[in-house]
């Protein structure tokens, strides 16, 4: 168990690591040859130009201005200088609201920490509960004297913790309500002021029913011309182009290798590069690399054209789904937010994501299989969570010197050294846990993709939800259980049964030391490592040396990245959970969390301004999830405090805590009804106002050309591929774009005397058979 000395060693290691990362960043960012790594967002906006194009030879690569080294920390005030409205214009509402999560952490925990340290810490410190606990052989450390563990059973001092629990709850709820109100207003204002985008006029229609007499495209056109005659404008059916997309990706990879060997040959024309054609180039016949890849690209071009023809001619490649666009935002809002058919499983509509946000491969998944896929992933996630208890138990064994000596007695002579003991107990458990979790976000994202979500934002939200549940069960509850009940097992066996609940009550707060070490590793050094961008830095210079030939190549090599919401938001929620749980129990943990929120806010604000380039904009659609998880953490903290006090003989004060979860739950229901609709539905009033203003400003704007190809699959947007079929089936009038489309007659036949024979697959005439 970590002592105050162990915590001090861990703090020194992590602070030193964070300082090294920040100093390295401050120096590397001002070097001209790293400019594209640390300021890629400004290059993508066309505002910043490369310093390598001007100046003396040395100054093109190394910053020789000594004054800039004296101002190496000026990135900190610069990161805080940009006001929020300008930040929204610069990076989008998603990025600005994401930063507000860190601000909420500061708003909640700074006042709570001041209150806890001024009231709870003196109350805990002046008690003598741990001296009595030693008589029952319960292990503890110096840091536990600052926690609730140091209060004697049945003491009236527990009333202080009860009052503080109410104060913490009311303050947290107040901050959450104000933030929910603020973010909801920001979202509505953002949507109202947003520039014209295709997704504002478009809905995604899924589970289009099969018709034996009409193709999917004709069915969609007929349905919306009949049911939305005044607002329907155009549509684009969805294709299963996954095989074609795979070929296009393969061609792109092959082209990169061709570029690499051509560049290599231009630098040294005395030797033509050669490769082996076998597996990974390890064996096989040696051939000319350039000729080989030129031949491969020609072969892939032929395969791509064949696959395109197949998609064009094969009606089975058309999925029962379509992107349907309307003449007005009002029409799209009505369609997206209403039931289209008496059968609630058909003609399912939802707001279309941005075209750049669509996860095209999942649109090819049959809608009827989504339920089965999600059931499979629920089961897989259960087993993933369950079996991960094994590494969690291993991590907790590292937090105990006794456990290490028992499992690895040959290390006893090494770990008995005071310095090694401090490093092992204060630093090693946190870093090992972080290493175990490093691939988890990617695994959860793969699971979300398998479930069939069709937008990047929905994929990230589902992965974030699962990551949050995983952290709650394994990282938090798993660490507490394996770190308290298991390590006190010997004590349990030697005492009477009625003493066991008291021992558990004293032991639970002891795990605060482990979480403190984890916060320092992940929240201090980890955040400082985020701003250094070591991996993108290395890969940029490798690509710049081996592959880059043009400015476009150099731009693609920048890799600005983005906020990985599915990985970062659950991590933030873990800190909310730890802070709310331990605020009335072990307040000494709160300063470590506050440092995390402050440092993370500074770092991510800098990254959002200068580095990240978001793939999509959801207008803060994720905020209800953020709010709900903080509420969940608050309720969990209240329940755990009740359980803890019930083992401490606080029979008089504990029942008063029963009201807290009830109050919190009804507060959540109030916020859900008051603010959440702004994130789920688009008001028709605002849609009509925006349509009216736009028509007044641009009365002659032709919306059809703007929308008609907005949602064509990216593999059909190549410059060398134009196909009139997509004009023909996209559902817009091609005779004259200024004329209104008229209702086309349905191709369905009467079922009274005619058998239901499909005519959609007939390649010849589409007219009804003669009688």
Swiss-Prot record:
Source superkingdom: Eukaryota
Tissue-level expression: Preferentially expressed in guard cells.
Spans through the membrane: 7-27, 101-121, 158-178, 375-395, 427-447, 467-487, 512-532, 584-604, 630-650, 651-671
Listed GO biological process terms: pathogen-associated molecular pattern receptor signaling pathway; stomatal movement
Catalytic activity: Ca(2+)(in) = Ca(2+)(out)
Keyword tags: Calcium, Cell membrane, Immunity, Innate immunity, Ion channel, Ion transport, Membrane, Phosphoprotein, Plant defense, Transmembrane, Transmembrane helix, Transport
Regulation of catalytic or functional activity: Activated following phosphorylation at Ser-54 by BIK1.
Similarity annotation: Belongs to the CSC1 (TC 1.A.17) family.
Protein name: Hyperosmolality-gated Ca2+ permeable channel 1.3
